[in-house]
């Protein structure tokens, strides 16, 4: 799945970080230069007690267009 956001990378980067924190997901690592956040979630998501690492990738396509993808780390 790819989410297309009509905003510049720096703004989307901040918004994604805030959204992850507000939803209670634990950010394990982030790299703004690479455009990645790695976060973990656990049993609340129905994983049977196992924690799963997920990764959000941000890619600036144009000056005001950023693409987001999410997948297992």
Residue ranges and their predicted role:
Residues 1-73:
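Ser/Thr-rich, low-complexity intrinsically disordered terminal regions
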